[in-house]
Every structure is written in C-alpha cells, then in structure tokens.
Amino acid sequence: MDLKNKGMLVVFSGPSGCGKDTVLDKIKEKGYVFDKTVSVTTRAMRDGEINGVDYYFVSKEEFLEKIKNNEFVEYTEYSGNYYGTLKSEIENRVSKGGCVLLKIEVEGAENIKKAFNEAVSIFIFPPSKEALKNRLLGRGTETEESFNIRYNTALKEMAKAPQYDYVVINDNVDLCAETVCGILNAEKTKYLRMQTIIDEILNK
C-alpha cells in the first residue's frame, strides 16, 4: 500500500554559536532526509551548474518582478547578487509529502511563519551564556568588537525563543539531534498531516 502523508516545512533557527549546523549534520547522519528547495539567483551560472537543479538563474529585472509579485518566502542580497526561496518551491514539495527544512535567521523565520502557518519552528538554544561566549570565542576569528556585536545579537535572538513551537537546548549534540528527530517524527503523525492517508484507508 503506497500511501503518503502530507509533508511539512521545518523552520530551523538559533543564534550564532548555538551549534545548529553541527546538530543538523548529526540529524542527517541519523538518516533523516530533507527535500532540497531550488533557490532563485541573479548571479551568473558556473561551469557544471544546471538551471532548475542547482538554482533558477534569472535576470535582476526578473528577480525584482518576483519580489513585486510577492513570490518569495524570503530573499537576500549578497555580493551584488540576489538569492531567494520561492513560495511555490516549498508548496510543491510539501504537497508531495516532502519534509522541507529551512535553516534561517530569526528575522526571516518570523516572515516564513506568517506565510506558512502550519510550519514547524524549532529553536536551538545554548546551555548557558557562558557556553555561548566560549563557542563564539573558540572560532578564533573574532575581534573584540565583532565578538561583542555577535554576542549581543545572539542575546536578542534568544529572547525571541517564545515565538517558536519548540526550543531544544544543545548541551549535548547527540541528545539534541535525537530530540529534534523525535519532534519531526511526532509532527509527521499529527492528524493534519495524516488526514489524507486516514481518509484513503477509510474509503477503500
């Protein structure tokens, strides 16, 4: 019996230094597969890249038109080029039962939750302010000024944790990843995502 439940969009956030990249890598190591969305960009196509696979390559004028038409769930400008995630990309994958994960900054996460109210939001929280400081300083790339900026920004972002559905403290990477996997598995079996399967079973 080939039955598919409704997919979901996962918003994955946390302050700089909370270890969210490491946690995400660990989740993938455990065999969790996420659907990849194809972003739109105005940068030039590089050798070996395929339009529609690596990116959707468009002109600046086309990109700005998409902004005007409210087609993006989020977009940014970096080094003179625009990058954005289309709402239609997420909707298409979720409708086919996929699990789309967007690792995104706190500010962007707020916009995504407004656009997709069924999105599952997870915030990775450091175990203490001291641990956060040590992780930021441990990178060895921070000047005193840049550290202060990143640390104060992180504190402001941590204050936004109540806006998320789930908050997971990253005191141990393996345990944190297991907790996130548990959240994802539980969310997959919520009635709103199982309804199609249930209806199909009942109507056979």
Which stretches of residues belong to each language-model region?
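Post-Walker A helix-loop "phosphate-sensing" segment adjacent to the P-loop in P-loop NTPases
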Residues: K28-T37
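Conserved phosphate-donor/acceptor-positioning beta-strand/loop module used by diverse small-molecule
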Residues: V100-E105, K114-G138, N170
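Conserved lysine of the Walker
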Residues: K20
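P-loop (Walker A) phosphate-binding loop of NTP-binding proteins
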Residues: S13-P15
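ATP-dependent small-molecule kinase phosphotransfer cores
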Residues: T41-V100, E107-E110
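Post-Walker A alpha-helix
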Residues: V23-L24
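Extreme N-terminal, non-catalytic leader segments
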Residues: M1-L9
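NTP-dependent small-molecule kinase module
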Residues: L3, E142, K156-K204
